[in-house]
Swiss-Prot record:
Flavoprotein keyword on record: no
Coiled-coil residues: none
Name of the protein: Uncharacterized RNA methyltransferase EF_2706
Keywords: 4Fe-4S, Iron, Iron-sulfur, Metal-binding, Methyltransferase, S-adenosyl-L-methionine, Transferase
Record: residues binding [4Fe-4S] cluster: C76, C82, C85, C165
GO BP terms, alphabetized: rRNA base methylation
Organismal lineage: Bacteria, Bacillati, Bacillota, Bacilli, Lactobacillales
Organism in which the protein naturally occurs: Enterococcus faecalis (strain ATCC 700802 / V583)
Listed InterPro entries: MeTrfase_TrmA_AS, NA-bd_OB-fold, SAM-dependent_MTases_sf, TRAM_dom, U5_MeTrfase_fam
Residues that hold S-adenosyl-L-methionine according to the record: Q289, Y318, D339, D387
Top EC class, one word: transferase
Amino acid sequence: MTQQLVKKGQQISLKIKRLGINGEGIGYYKKLIIFVPGALPKEEVTATITNVTPKFAEGTLQSVKKAAKDRVVPPCPVYETCGGCQLQHLAYKAQLDFKKDLLKQALNKFKPANYQNYELRKTIGMDNPWNYRNKAQFQLRQIDGQVEAGLYQADSHQLVPIDNCLVQQPATTKVMNTLVDLLNDFQLPIYDERKNSGIFRTLMVRVGIQTGEVQVVFITQSQKFPQKEKMVRAINEQLPEVVSIMQNVQNKKTSLVMGDDTLHLWGKESIEEHINDVVFDLSPRAFFQLNPEQTEVLYNEGIKALDLQPNETVVDAYCGVGTIGLSLAKQAHQVRGMDTIPAAIDDARFNAKRLGVTNTHYAVGTAEDLLPKWFKEGFKPDAIVVDPPRTGLDRKLLTALLKQPPKKMVYISCNVSTLARDLVQLAKVYQVDYLQSVDMFPQTARCEVVVKLTRK
């Protein structure tokens, strides 16, 4: 049936109704849903069909016959090939409206109890929605004899060289470009995944926005590092802002960028960052939000939603280096946090000690294993804050929360679909007070949401 409606290679005219979760335009052709990246709501476009399935088809934008008033010219020269951003062609105010609408779409799909009456607050955006990312993680490739660093084109392993990413902090761009020049100067062997040869796979550069400290991580196929001393000396001479040089070994066939072994090459083993007057040490593998300016906004919204009293205890699930929990520690009687990465827990403990915070307890493990264990031991928290990965809450953790729900909960989500799915369960024991979206990643389709929940 679908094959008769539309064929691969066919050119069709479409009216775009809305944007999908990846920022792509959505239209209907003879009742078949068509996804067209780059198209905007209220536009009339021509698209060429590239993929057909029984339930939907995908197309590439050929021309815009009637443009939306919110369409703007993307300032990035590689915007259409890079795949890192999805919304540069949409005016920023409209991006904020879209992110609130995404949340509405997800709730409509999963229909948690009473969802039509949820309070959805306006998305909090940035004054300057550019140059916000504190970390660049660029793949390396030898192209025509030259080392290039960049990102893979969407759904491919085709590298798009990038020497000025408009959403990156300028400090990371400067360091990245200098490192690429040095790799070329020293003619170091770049990893080739087809031949499984070479050494240098990826460069990671992270900057502490408040401190100006920069960390460089060379991600390599093996522990080998030809001309290591020369490279370190050159970085010292040309990039005095770099205070930490590390090497991470990733020799497995996996989509994970980093491996388990991290080697210290020079300087400090971590860099400092400040959020809400709390100082954090960031080691190479430690998770830390990519937009520190909006992270402060996000966590302040979380703190406000929790409304902790001095006698209350709180669990910081998925705690990372302790960013949320340490921001809460002043207001709470005790904070307990957990994370699966031992280095992150080490950082969280160190951060607490350095700040003189004595009312925290950090443990290595999953929230779904540790929370039931703590419940059995008699620790019954008054509040819990969860900041899970994009996959949402683990089923075992949800079960534990449904059995013994703390009286207050804040859910910080980076994926509106898994949030809406989890709210179906959480709404059985919690009232959803409000949802506050925060734009952590301007120019992309991603959005963070703070949800305030109170036990029924």
